[in-house]
């Protein structure tokens, strides 16, 4: 990949080995006059780099190398290495929002329920890869039971039994799988998507709506718009942020921070 950058651009490539090494990389990034931080990897890698430059003048660029590449796709960046490096070199920049879930930053989506449950099982599975993820998903699809949640936002409180709740800063999980097609990255708002309990047969209708980019039109889905949200559940359990699972307490607090991150975008970006 190194030879593909234009000759007039100075860059340094660093491969970090562990958390301590990554901290050293960040020290270098912030102590010198670098203008951009380019993350090469999937949404987990992108999250690590992005959260380290929130509120700075350093712009995030992405060379997508993951399975979903949700943020890269939303930013209109190419999945082709040569093309995305051209986009990075052109350097078109905008500012986007980021969210926090119990003070943990995320940039695409976060949530609780089925998707967090699957992420937690996959993280502890001995088998890796897409095949293992799909196998776990189908195994758990009808085993998993919807849970009761209390949501507080916009001076209201609602109680819902939900299969999952997704808090979307960006509209998609990845792979152009849009759970919140009307969400915008720079409007200072989350789209809170509640998937209600469904039957075996109705799940296909939900999937068709999502695959067509019309999840908000499904009768099994409710969507609300807010910049702050508190979700309370009866017990501790997994959440996810940009697909990364973590066990968290009963109360989950979300906050949206308006245009807090500078990013490099492609010509097809429509998030403003």
Language-model regions, residue ranges each:
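Glycine-rich beta-strand-to-loop/alpha-helix junction loops that act as flexible
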Residues: 40-42, 63-65
């Amino acid at each position: 990949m190194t030879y593909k950058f234009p000759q007039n651009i100075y860059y340094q490539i660093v491969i970090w080995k562990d958390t301590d090494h990554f901290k050293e990389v960040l020290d270098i990034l912030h102590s010198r006059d670098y203008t951009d931080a380019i993350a090469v990897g999937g949404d987990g890698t992108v999250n690590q780099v992005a959260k380290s430059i929130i509120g700075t003048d350093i712009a995030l660029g992405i060379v997508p190398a993951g399975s979903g590449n949700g943020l890269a796709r939303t930013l209109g960046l190419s999945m082709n290495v040569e093309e995305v490096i051209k986009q990075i070199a052109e350097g078109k920049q905008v500012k986007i929002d980021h969210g926090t879930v119990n003070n943990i930053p995320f940039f695409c989506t976060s949530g609780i329920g089925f998707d967090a449950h699957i992420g937690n099982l996959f993280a502890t599975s001995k088998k890796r890869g897409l095949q293992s993820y799909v196998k776990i998903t189908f195994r758990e699809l009808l085993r998993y039971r919807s849970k009761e949640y209390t949501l507080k936002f916009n001076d209201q409180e609602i109680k819902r039994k939900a299969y999952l709740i997704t808090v979307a800063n960006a509209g998609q999980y990845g792979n152009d799988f849009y759970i919140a097609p009307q969400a915008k990255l720079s409007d200072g708002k989350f789209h809170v998507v509640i998937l209600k309990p469904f039957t075996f047969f109705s799940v296909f209708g939900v999937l068709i709506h999502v695959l067509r980019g019309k999840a908000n039109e499904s009768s099994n889905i409710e969507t609300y718009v807010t910049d702050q949200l508190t979700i309370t559940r009866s017990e501790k359990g997994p959440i996810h942020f940009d697909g990364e699972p973590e066990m968290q307490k009963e109360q989950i607090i979300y906050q949206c921070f308006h245009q807090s991150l500078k990013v490099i975008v492609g010509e097809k970006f429509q998030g403003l």
